[in-house]
From Swiss-Prot:
Its EC number is 3.5.1.15. Belongs to the AspA/AstE family. Aspartoacylase subfamily. It is an enzyme of class 3 (hydrolase). GO terms for cellular component: cytosol; nucleus. It is found in: Cytoplasm; Nucleus. Its main location: cytoplasm. Catalyzes the deacetylation of N-acetylaspartic acid (NAA) to produce acetate and L-aspartate. The keyword Zinc applies. It comes from Danio rerio (Zebrafish). This is Aspartoacylase. Its cofactor is Zn(2+). CDD domains: M14_ASPA (cd06909).
Amino acid sequence: MSSRTNISCLQEAKRVAIFGGTHGNEMSGIVLANMWIQNATEIERKGLVCKPFITNPRAVEKCTRYIDTDLNRAFTPENLSASELEALPYEVQRAKEINQMFGPKGGSDAYDVIFDLHNTTSNMGSTLILESSTDLFNLQMVHYIKKAMAPHTCSVLLNEHPQLKYSTTRSVAKHPVGLEVGPQPQGVLRSNVFESMRTILKHALDFIELFNNGVEFPPCTVNVFRVQERMDYPRDTNGNITAMVHPHLQDCDWEPLNRGDPMFLTFDGRTILYEGANTVYPTFINEAAYYEKQQAFVTTCREILAANAIRKAFK
């Protein structure tokens, strides 16, 4: 079979949105989106509509994660089809509005690409989040971004877990991409984190412009971390946390956690070891926003995904 046979011809990406403020205290995306709303020169690309947008303005105004419920979990079929006559939480109302503007989710008229900009208090560095292992466009794009960012690291988190995958703000698009850059405290703007996010978006938009101009991207492989399990803190019978992330694990996102390694440190000084059968790679370690979600960290496994060559489909 010739290499030409393996080229996947994909539709041009004509409409791109950049979402900031899905969580109203994650400042890098908020500032970038507002900056580009005022002056979009930096994100303009020939033949491409690129719309910066603040998704949760009330939460941004109050510098809080959300008002009533997490917007980044609100894009379920039930919420998007809820009657306007119902007394809906603010973020559910907002999800319906965003779906009308940038969707409909799963529809042919949805935006081609949505970049949803997030910060984490965890030591994750620059991370791209994907929701599908078969989206050739996104796989080729993150491969391009990772090469452009070198020698700086840009990790790729893949969440296809049937129980742990959630209905994200970006899932409205045909090609949803999350950006998670940290560590950065909530409500704080750090220049290095801000510039990393800005650089990732530049490379992403460059890729889309090249693709739309007919550039063919050869087959590639992408190293990803696949979400496996959510780990909670140890708790007592009343549900109260009884231990902290162990100092040997703290700030060690993406590093191997082996059986027998320290995982938690109880308040009375006892070390709790990891007892899993296989080595895992934790991330979102001690994320501040996830205490309410009963999550100390997420375990992942390493995987290599292969993507066919792609080019724009010519009419």
